[in-house]
């Protein structure tokens, strides 16, 4: 008898059906348990005195059913199904043997003990099929019974037709029943009608009560809703209720402008009113506050006449010269001009002198062949994981002209505690649309390789060399570790970031190194920006 691996190979080559029923795998007349061991040795076992391990039937069968998946996806799905995984070094050799590309394999242990399959009984199956076929055959006795039933039914219907009441046999109710019996029937009908009407009235009264209760509840609810105030937060304000977002923004700007120019418009002087002299205005009496020296007030000037003491005088706000010159100098002293309060809108700078932005700008290549594009920039720089642009396109992501990423970092406080803060960075791929004042905020650029990427940039040399650009902006180059470095990048001052094709767990250290390098550069050259 052949081993289970050979039978599986034969069925796979001939494209025969393999039935999995419960914990058994059925190959025609033979069946094996799922956990039966084959004679294919697991890679890495049986060396240096270690015992040999063999792949089970369900692990190889699961590989055949999921051969179209990539190995990482296959491993995750097998772990979910709690099935042993076929290791990557054995995958190609095992599939070649099962598909008939190779007649044998070096990993097949011919001396391994063979598991004998169970032979299924075909006679039992054949007997069951015969019973099912016999059950499907119509019996002659059953057909005879059906025919007799139809004849009886037809005869009964014919008899019913013959016994139909004729119009000559109809008599009046007074001839068939007594008057007393007819009166009793009428009394029962009237009593039933009265009870029915009474029930309907009760239902109407109940419905009326419920309706009045609902109306009262509606009035109370309307009163409560009229006193409600919508809780407005930063998030709810930014969520527009209509298609035109400008309506919400303009309403907010109008309210802010009205608050800055003055809450009460009636306080502004009318344009046609005559100006009033401020000296003619009646001074409002200032209420006297409590003074602990009120009990020592002098009764009159006659008691201090000989001392020449001015009990109402003060040296507050006077210079030394005015004090030494005496009271005459104090009389000629003019009061200091009081500062005139200005409205809030005048205290702030005008719109054309608004404060510039402190958000740093990162420029990335616009070419679709670049590893970092506008589709995956947020995944790379914010989430610190590499997602190819093609995969983002398959997910239906739309390309934006620019994006704003939120970088999370730990910031040390004076007490020695660290708090997590979020710093915004603006990412663009069209630098020619930047304003002249925006170039001072450009802190990093991702270089692709060709020099034409910097065409039209400031600080570009006449020969087209971007050497001076890299002296003012920190440059980075993102590539795979197996790809050869571009010759232009080798001779430029560019920090190279290498990614692995398959090891996605190494992406985070690479992008953390990018942020550390950029932070050191900004501390030295761009300390006025927010980072």
From Swiss-Prot:
The ranges of region (Interaction with CTNNB1) come to: 200-250
GO biological process entries: cellular response to lipopolysaccharide; endodermal cell fate commitment; mRNA 3'-end processing; negative regulation of apoptotic process; negative regulation of cell population proliferation; negative regulation of epithelial cell proliferation; negative regulation of fibroblast proliferation; negative regulation of G1/S transition of mitotic cell cycle
Q: Where is this region: Disordered?
A: 260-292, 325-358
Q: Where Phosphoserine occurs along the chain?
A: 212
Q: Which UniProt keywords apply?
A: Acetylation, Cell cycle, Isopeptide bond, Nucleus, Phosphoprotein, Transcription, Tumor suppressor, Ubl conjugation, Wnt signaling pathway
Residue ranges annotated as compositionally biased, kind Pro residues, are 338-352
Q: How is it modified after translation?
A: Phosphorylated. Dephosphorylated by PTPN11.
Q: Where is this region: Interaction with POLR2A and PAF1?
A: 200-531
Q: Where is this cross-link: Glycyl lysine isopeptide (Lys-Gly) (interchain with G-Cter in SUMO2)?
A: 198, 301, 308, 321
Residues where N-acetylalanine is found? 2
Top-rank taxon of the source lineage equals Eukaryota
GO MF annotation list: RNA polymerase II complex binding
Compartments where located: Nucleus
Q: Where is this motif: Nuclear localization signal?
A: 125-139
Instruction: State the Pfam families in the record.
Output: CDC73_C (PF05179), CDC73_N (PF16050)
Q: Which GO terms describe its cellular component?
A: Cdc73/Paf1 complex; nucleus
* Assembly mode: Component of the PAF1 complex, which consists of CDC73, PAF1, LEO1, CTR9, RTF1 and SKIC8. The PAF1 complex interacts with PHF5A. Within the PAF1 complex interacts directly with PHF5A. Interacts with POLR2A, CPSF1, CPSF4, CSTF2, KMT2A/MLL1 and CTNNB1. Interacts with a Set1-like complex that has histone methyltransferase activity and methylates histone H3. Found in a complex with BCL9L or BCL9, CDC73, CTNNB1 and PYGO1 indicative for the participation in a nuclear Wnt signaling complex. Interacts with PTPN11. Interacts with SETD5.
Protein family (similarity comment)? Belongs to the CDC73 family.
Tell me, in a sentence or two, what this protein's role is.
Tumor suppressor probably involved in transcriptional and post-transcriptional control pathways. May be involved in cell cycle progression through the regulation of cyclin D1/PRAD1 expression. Component of the PAF1 complex (PAF1C) which has multiple functions during transcription by RNA polymerase II and is implicated in regulation of development and maintenance of embryonic stem cell pluripotency.
Name of the molecule in the record: Parafibromin
The species this protein belongs to is Rattus norvegicus (Rat)
